[in-house]
UniProtKB/Swiss-Prot annotation:
Keyword Transport part of the UniProt annotation: no
Pfam families: Brix
GO cellular component: nucleolus; preribosome, large subunit precursor
Compartments reported by the entry: Nucleus, Nucleolus
The name this protein goes by in its record: Ribosome production factor 1
Domain Brix: 142-325
Swiss-Prot/TrEMBL GO biological process terms: maturation of 5.8S rRNA; maturation of LSU-rRNA
Region (Disordered): 1-105
Organism annotation: Pongo abelii
Gene3D superfamilies associated with the record: Probable brix-domain ribosomal biogenesis protein
Length: 349
């Protein structure tokens, strides 16, 4: 009986302590409300003295309340500083200092010696004599063959079919066990200008080989983040047969310039702007994001975009001279992670 009485008395003391803590919290909250309503803010030193640490408060409810107040005070100070800075900039007008640029990995990129200068004579000579010169001189028109690895599954097949609706004058062919070395001569004999091979692993597309015909080069990409049309939310209607516009972003080095020209050679020269379709290859930190959109003109001044799909991400693994040759091919560039990925601010495209 004595033990039961001790337990009841201890539980009664705990309940009294909880009530006292709750009353203290209510009084503190009421005092804060009165202070804010009267327009007089409590001094910061009284609320948060020097060396004050919220983590030292043992009462959980009290600690949570003080942390909430501290966050509110931080937001108010930040907003007040932003308003003050805005007023100062408006008062200075044109004499206001430029806005500070936030530091990002992109604008802190390590300078690459192979960065392309459009006015460089050497670059102009290379463009006039490389494998894509006949396309850019409008001597040839693109004709693309899209194929897969052996025994493709449904997801890879649907990706090929949807790519054929994005790239004009492209044809889907199922290999049926035929080796790539035998496919390439047949493509050249039938005047195909490019060959696209989509590889898969565990029923998921994971690689893309792009070979420019008849003389190369051949690029091998890792493919990830594949989304088919049905998997894209708020997508538009299926694309039309109009020739899309092509946008290439941030291909700045000599290697990136070659990859950009390779993508450009997949599409015909004169886009049909009436179709309002655009294919984008956006390079960011050596990842190439592919998107296919349609322009939506809401008014004379406002325009939006509507994604049509598919979408995927590419990362260059190697660039090989000539057509596909896995044994004796000469490689211009190969990605070596241990040697090349030594800095997060160094990019190759």
């Amino acid at each position: 009986m004595a033990k039961a009485g001790d337990k009841s008395s201890s539980s009664g003391k705990k309940s009294l302590k909880r009530k006292a803590a709750a009353e203290e919290l209510q009084e503190a909250a009421g005092a804060g409300d009165v202070a804010t309503e009267s327009g007089v803010q409590p001094p910061k030193a009284a609320a948060f003295p020097p060396g004050f640490s919220i983590s030292e408060i043992k009462n959980k409810e009290r600690r949570h309340l003080m942390f909430t107040r501290w966050k509110q005070q931080q937001r108010k100070e930040k907003l007040a500083a932003k308003k003050k800075l805005k007023k100062e900039r408006e008062a200075l007008g044109d004499k206001a200092p430029p806005k500070p640029v936030p530091k990002t990995i992109d604008n802190q990129r390590v300078y690459d010696e192979t960065t392309v200068d459009p006015n460089d004579e050497e670059v102009a000579y290379d463009e006039a004599t490389d494998e894509f010169a006949s396309y850019f001189n409008k001597q040839t028109s693109p004709k693309i063959l899209i194929t897969t690895s052996d025994r493709p599954h449904g997801r890879t097949v649907r990706l090929c079919e949807q790519l054929s609706t994005v790239i004009p004058n492209s044809h889907v062919y199922y290999r049926r066990g035929l080796a790539l070395k035998k496919i390439i001569p047949q493509c050249i004999a039938r005047d195909f200008t490019d060959l696209i091979v989509i590889n898969e692993d565990r029923k998921t597309p994971n690689g893309l080989i792009l070979s420019h015909l008849p003389n190369g080069p051949t690029a091998h990409f890792k493919m990830s983040s594949v989304r088919l049309r049905k998997e894209i939310k708020r997508r538009g209607k299926d694309p039309t047969e109009h020739i899309p516009e092509i946008i290439l972003n941030n291909f700045t080095t000599r290697l990136g310039h070659s990859i950009g020209r390779m993508f450009a050679s997949l599409f015909p020269h004169n886009p049909q702007f009436i179709g309002r379709q655009v294919a984008t290859f956006h390079n960011q930190r050596d990842y190439i994001f592919f998107r296919f959109h349609r322009y939506i003109f809401r008014s004379e001044k406002k325009v939006g975009i509507q994604e049509l799909g598919p979408r995927f991400t590419l990362k260059l693994r190697s660039l090989q001279k000539g057509t596909f040759d896995s044994k004796y091919g000469e490689y211009e560039w190969v990605h070596k992670p241990r040697e090349m990925d030594t800095s997060r601010r160094k990019f190759h495209l």
